[in-house]
């Protein structure tokens, strides 16, 4: 499988951020985000982890009732990224 260029990875990251902005302040599971941007779940997770390192998204480790997630990951846009996106839109 050919490597994806940095430019294309950047465009996919923009799609993810756009989706998270639309549903903000809600968090979404990795599988739902992958479905929305029509990408593989593992690939989407790798992009989300890059965005987390850049402090653009935040990983949610607990469910609404306080239970810890062991297998799943939910993601939401960070507050700083949300404010920056809000100024653009």
Question: Over which residues does each language-model region extend?
Answer:
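Long, compositionally biased intrinsically disordered regions
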Residues: 2-3, 36, 65, 89
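Short alpha-helical segments that sit at the start of domains
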Residues: 1-17
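Short, locally clustered residues in the helix-turn-helix/winged-helix DNA-binding domain
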Residues: 18-25
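Short, amphipathic alpha-helical interaction segments positioned at domain boundaries
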Residues: 73-89
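Short acidic, hydrophobic short linear motifs in intrinsically disordered regions
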Residues: 25-36
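A short, conserved structural fragment
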Residues: 52-64
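Short amphipathic alpha-helical interaction segments
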Residues: 38-53
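Short, Lys/Arg-rich nucleic-acid/phosphate-binding segment
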Residues: 61-73
